[in-house]
């Protein structure tokens, strides 16, 4: 970096020394430039280049000069400020290879930001620039290095092609060996001599003499080029003219330059501001126009933003706060309303269609919850690049200009964000792969067991006859015990049914199974004769038939059957594990008030955590809140269905169940408000909320819902397990796809909203 700066300064002031009289003549006769400019090389606006260069020179002279001239002391201050007054020893432990790819950045501000990254907290950033000022070791060496600096963008001009090939390796090796070859005193004295010469010619411009670095005949060799070079002498030759003093009073040359920093130009902006085409190769003469602008930007630090300035210039979050409140309120309202509408599905709970629907909804919830955790919540909790991008972008644009924000900020942020997105998608791929493996292995095992069972044939006619007799005996036994069972249930277990609403009549077969589980625990031996036919009358008849003849294993068979019945009861009546597992008798004894309190507290705490996640997500941005809201909605629907089933079995009416669920949903609004306040007013707390929410989502998805998907009771209803398998895969992949689309187009959603 110091090598470039040395070349820029030497070339600028050396060229200004070689032809001062011609510049005075050009200033006295401005019509000369107008006549020659049409003959200038196509693609370059000479007038604009001259005026822009004049502006930057006046900025430098106003900053360091007095009476329209630059003294030795002022020039020394300029060199010290940009960090090339002498060689300084610093210890920075980082890889220097990044200096060899300047063309990758293609703009001054990114390289300048990287060079000054370690000095943002103090004002001694000259040391860092001096790390690269080893190019100032000799005068002859400086002459060839100015076009070499621009070899990245030109590469076609013969004057520039000399140093193009060796630019990067020599630049890197020169930094390593400079301490052995050049002493600090030599470079300091050389720069001081250059300062003395340049300043002397500026002050005594009436009697110019050529500098040591350039020949005398430069001014007479190419008149068109020389006429177009309005360098420092144009400013110095007008000491008595008001053309210099008037701009100093204007808004461009006010003393408030530091308060209103200049725009940070990249390579394209520098060329266009000087009237040069982006595709036009630069030679040394044309590059001379750019030198004052480059030096002015380095000196004014237009491309640096200090930490204190960032915090001071960040605009208030009024816009994002409004979006957070509106979006969070709408999201919570939609989720609560649609979840309450799930009560219309309660009458369908005993139908096969409901099993398919619930299986798909659970799989969709798994996909959205895990997708939101891996693709959105965890990436945002690990890195705050999106958070800083959304809030710091106005300040960055004020400081650096819209072109820089579009070219650098967008590309870097998108590449970093997509990297975390693909890693999260890889984690989801591992999760889905293990789900497929476990599910497919289970299906294969069940298929083999079914095949072995079908292959078992009766060996002789005696076995067939025995089975027929056992079947007759079973039917007679069930008929005889039916009366006793009716009397017992009338006196005991069904006494509470007379007090229930009529809408529970359709659920009595399911309740009988619950009661039989309780009976089996209390009296395993006494009620065995009535327990078997009643429980196995419809669903477990074949299992009982296969083992009933084995009189030696009756007790063992009883325990096996009890396990199967209890497992079937759990799967049949609690398709989603959010709902509490209570028998009907327990629900009745508990009372409506106690159960309502349990639902409000248990389900309300869950809704509060969901609202907290939604509120914090909307403070991050609209797309963040959208993805979290979709994930919450997809797992709230089956969750609310389970809660409705529990409340209705407790004896509540539909209106009461809706009311208590609505009360628990109110806690979601409280959680949303808490999340918005924390995310907006607390520093970086929303990142911790995202991490906590990701853990909650993954627990609900992987611990609660995935086991329900793996252990479904499709075969008990005569349904194909493969049909369930494909339906569950469709739900999971749909959830993954929704979260992936939101994650990929998240930055575009924010961009459109901002405009």
UniProtKB/Swiss-Prot annotation:
Phosphoserine found at: 471, 478
Pfam families, sorted: Zip (PF02535)
Main location class: membrane
Cytoplasmic side: 347-355, 445-657, 708-724
Extracellular compartment spans: 29-325, 377-423, 679-686, 746-755
Entry's localization field: Cell membrane; Cell projection, Lamellipodium membrane; Membrane raft; Apical cell membrane
Keyword field: Cell membrane, Cell projection, Coiled coil, Glycoprotein, Ion transport, Membrane, Phosphoprotein, Signal, Transmembrane, Transmembrane helix, Transport, Zinc, Zinc transport
A single cellular component GO annotation: plasma membrane
Listed Basic residues bias regions: 129-144
Post-translational modification: Cleaved on the N-terminus before locating to the plasma membrane.
GO biological process: epithelial to mesenchymal transition; intracellular monoatomic cation homeostasis; intracellular zinc ion homeostasis; lymphocyte activation; T cell receptor signaling pathway; zinc ion import across plasma membrane; zinc ion transmembrane transport
Bilayer topology annotation: Multi-pass membrane protein
Induction: Up-regulated by estrogen in breast cancer cells lines. Decreased protein level in response to zinc treatment. Increased upon T cell activation. Induced by STAT3.
Key word Coiled coil present: yes
Function: Zinc-influx transporter which plays a role in zinc homeostasis and in the induction of epithelial-to-mesenchymal transition (EMT). When associated with SLC39A10, the heterodimer formed by SLC39A10 and SLC39A6 mediates cellular zinc uptake to trigger cells to undergo epithelial- to-mesenchymal transition (EMT). The SLC39A10-SLC39A6 heterodimer also controls NCAM1 phosphorylation and its integration into focal adhesion complexes during EMT. Zinc influx inactivates GSK3B, enabling unphosphorylated SNAI1 in the nucleus to down-regulate adherence genes such as CDH1, causing loss of cell adherence.
Record note on quaternary structure: Interacts with SLC39A10; which triggers cells to undergo EMT and mitosis. Found in a complex with SLC39A6, SLC39A10 and with the 'Ser-727' phosphorylated form of STAT3 throughout mitosis. Found in a complex with SLC39A6, SLC39A10 and with NCAM1; this complex controls NCAM1 phosphorylation and integration into focal adhesion complexes during epithelial-to-mesenchymal transition (EMT). Found in a complex with SLC39A6, SLC39A10 and with GSK3B that controls NCAM1 phosphorylation.
Name the record gives this protein: Zinc transporter ZIP6
The organism's taxonomic lineage, starting at the top: Eukaryota, Metazoa, Chordata, Craniata, Vertebrata
